[in-house]
Amino acid sequence: MTQQPLIMITGAKMTPAKRHFTSQFGRIEYLTYQGQHYKMNAAAGVVKQLAGQYDLLVVGYQPDDAAIFAETCGVPTDRFIPADLRRAADIERTASQAAALQQELGVPLYVVHYGGASDTKAALPHNSLLAHTWDMEAMAIPDLVENNCVTLVKLLQALRQHGVFARQPYTKVISVTAAAAVRAKAHLGLDVAQKAAGHGLLRSIALDLTPENIFITEIMPGSTDTGFFDNDYTMDEAIRVTRDLGYDKTPETYPLFTAEQIGDAVKYVITAQCNVREIALLPYGQFPHLGA
């Protein structure tokens, strides 16, 4: 097999932009599809930064998203798999297609897994993950953990059953969680619960799989302009919590970066000639007291 791997990226999604932000480098330029501006979630940012440099297999949510990724990132529509990885049938279909493509191309397969940020069947107050403990919809936690943890374990098990790992000398599995996995913040209990669950699970998976030359990397990004902060309530609460910590931020100055930064971190892990266990990355200005 050649050294240039096939990269499977799960959880990729584009969201119509409802709010436009600026970064420390100026106004953020959003992707455009049929006249509409779109924001990338973490996985979509990985797609954008790797497209054209690697063969990609993108696992998203809706069939219609294939056309968006094709036009904005150059991903062929036959390399987009709409799937709900909480469903056993979709896991099997995804793993089967990935294994077949791995053998067709004759290259190693690496996995980039993203479990999403707020995928839950439970109704969230204000449609936001941000909530004080007294107002938190705790029944959302099982859904959030399922999307971040169960999907990863089931996918890895299915890929193993299809012989993916046995056909290559080593494998890189990169899971994108969040800085919230290790840095708690007021009113962010739901996000902390799902990402911290993923963080702990990944540490255990790494102990299990490293002896088999399956190397596990966790990437923990900070506040990202994915559409999460387009919700007015979420933005207002985030600013209030930030002010309680002594930082005078507004919607115009709230520290955010784009998902391209996450994609660049993934690119480094893919190319690094070593086992990269963890990467934490924050936008400039996000909670300097946590800078250490």
Feature map (PLM): residue ranges:
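Amphipathic alpha-helical dimer-interface segment in Rossmann-like NAD(P)H-dependent oxidoreductases
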Residues: 99-100, 116, 143-169, 207
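Catalytic loop of short-chain dehydrogenase/reductase
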Residues: 15-18, 132-137, 165-197, 202-203, ...
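C-terminal helical subdomain
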Residues: 150, 218, 237-292
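Conserved Rossmann-fold SDR core element
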Residues: 199, 209-226, 274-280
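Catalytic Tyr-X3-Lys loop
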Residues: 109-112, 127-153, 198
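Canonical Rossmann dinucleotide-binding motif of NAD(H)/NADP(H)-dependent dehydrogenases/reductases
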Residues: 2-56
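Rossmann-fold scaffold of SDR-type NAD(P)-dependent oxidoreductases
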Residues: 10, 106-124, 148, 175, ...
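Rossmann-fold cofactor-recognition segment
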Residues: 73-89
